[in-house]
């Protein structure tokens, strides 16, 4: 094709992509069904991972829950089973009201499987993934959600904690994706969800290891998405989730300027997950919550660094992590004193 003709064709496609993106904002696409599909969630024992599990359960997905904490993971599984029982009761009532003429997918056919897995350890991931394939089947939806934060200034952070943060928050995405992507490629079907953070798009002081891990996983996700497009595997979808500070306790104590905080409060976990689910079920490539994060990311990309610093200082975002780090340090000291260390 003539390069001039191709240039105008590409220009048209780019403009059309803007039109489609605008249409998605105005008219919400229909959500796809995940009923009966195997959905694996890492870090399912608490926080966003638990809420993702409950949302997928309500949509009749068959759940595989991974967490390093066996007890917490089983608690999540119990909540999922309760949802399944409620759905089963509702289906039974609907069948009775319809004299048995309606065909309804009974949730009693769905199960939840729990696995204790440290996703920061490569061999543990691969061994657990093999167990899942043998005991459950192939995974259709992979939600890479597990994450940790050390809560130390760089020069005070032990090397092993930095390595742990990178392993869990970033490297684990490589291992889980390598474990489950091959079958997705074979059948050209699946969905990979990367739960990152707004701190994977812009940074702040005092959380160098966390920001590095989240920037890394955002880069991994974007490259993977491009690789799937290059391979013309359009049946495999990807969604990048980048929420602002979520009120799960992970960053307890983090504060921006008090006059600004009412306009940009920590996100409620339920709201964050519901917004992410809308994006996942409509095959949206990326979601930042709240939408203001799109603007912040754009401004960070075009403004001079000193201008960004001025904005951070005005918002109180330059040292917003310092109270959180101080609380972590105090808690560590209290534990050491309690244990006689």
UniProtKB/Swiss-Prot annotation:
Pfam families from the UniProt entry: adh_short
Principal location: membrane
GO MF terms, alphabetically ordered: all-trans-retinol dehydrogenase (NAD+) activity; all-trans-retinol dehydrogenase (NADP+) activity; oxidoreductase activity, acting on the CH-OH group of donors, NAD or NADP as acceptor
Function: Retinol dehydrogenase with a clear preference for NADP. Converts all-trans-retinol to all-trans-retinal.
Keyword Nucleotide-binding applies: no
Protein name: Retinol dehydrogenase 10
Keywords: Endoplasmic reticulum, Lipid metabolism, Membrane, Microsome, NADP, Oxidoreductase, Signal-anchor, Transmembrane, Transmembrane helix
Catalyzed reactions per annotation: all-trans-retinol + NADP(+) = all-trans-retinal + NADPH + H(+)
Cellular location(s): Microsome membrane; Endoplasmic reticulum membrane
GO cellular component: cytoplasm; endoplasmic reticulum membrane; lipid droplet; membrane
Transmembrane parts of this sequence: 3-23
Topology of this chain in the membrane: Single-pass membrane protein
Active site: 210 (proton acceptor)
EC number of this enzyme: 1.1.1.300
Positions that bind NADP(+): 40-64
Similarity field: Belongs to the short-chain dehydrogenases/reductases (SDR) family.
Organism name: Rattus norvegicus
Tissue-wise expression: Detected in retina, entire eyecups and in liver (at protein level).
């Amino acid at each position: 094709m003539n390069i001039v003709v191709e240039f105008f064709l590409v220009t048209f496609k780019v403009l059309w992509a803007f039109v489609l993106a605008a249409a998605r904002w105005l008219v919400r696409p229909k959500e796809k069904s995940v009923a009966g599909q195997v959905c694996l969630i890492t870090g399912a024992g608490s926080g966003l991972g638990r809420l993702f599990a409950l949302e997928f359960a309500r949509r009749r997905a068959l759940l595989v829950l991974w967490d390093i904490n066996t007890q917490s993971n089983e608690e999540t599984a119990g909540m999922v089973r309760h949802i399944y029982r409620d759905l089963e009761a509702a289906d039974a009532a609907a069948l009775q009201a319809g004299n048995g003429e309606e065909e309804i997918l009974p949730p009693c056919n769905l199960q939840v499987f729990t696995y204790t897995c440290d996703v920061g350890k490569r061999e543990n991931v691969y061994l657990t993934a093999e167990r899942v394939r043998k005991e459950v089947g192939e995974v259709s939806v992979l939600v890479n959600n597990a994450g940790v934060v050390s809560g130390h200034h760089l020069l005070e952070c032990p090397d092993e904690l930095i390595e742990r943060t990178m392993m869990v928050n970033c490297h684990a995405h490589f291992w889980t994706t390598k474990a489950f992507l091959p079958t997705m490629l074979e059948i050209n079907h699946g969905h990979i969800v990367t739960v990152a953070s707004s701190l994977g798009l812009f940074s702040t002081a005092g959380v160098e290891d966390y920001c590095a891990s989240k920037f890394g996983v955002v880069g991994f996700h974007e490259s993977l998405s491009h690789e799937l497009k290059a391979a013309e595997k359009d049946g495999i979808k990807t969604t990048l989730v980048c929420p602002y500070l979520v009120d799960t306790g992970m960053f307890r104590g983090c504060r921006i300027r008090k006059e600004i905080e009412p306009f940009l409060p920590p996100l409620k976990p339920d709201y964050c997950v519901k917004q992410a689910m809308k994006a996942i079920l409509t095959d949206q490539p990326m979601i930042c919550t709240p939408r203001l994060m799109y603007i912040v990311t754009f401004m960070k990309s075009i403004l001079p660094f000193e201008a960004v610093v001025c904005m951070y200082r005005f918002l109180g975002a330059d040292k917003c992590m310092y109270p959180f780090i101080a609380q972590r340090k105090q808690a560590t000291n209290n534990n050491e004193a309690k244990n006689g260390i």
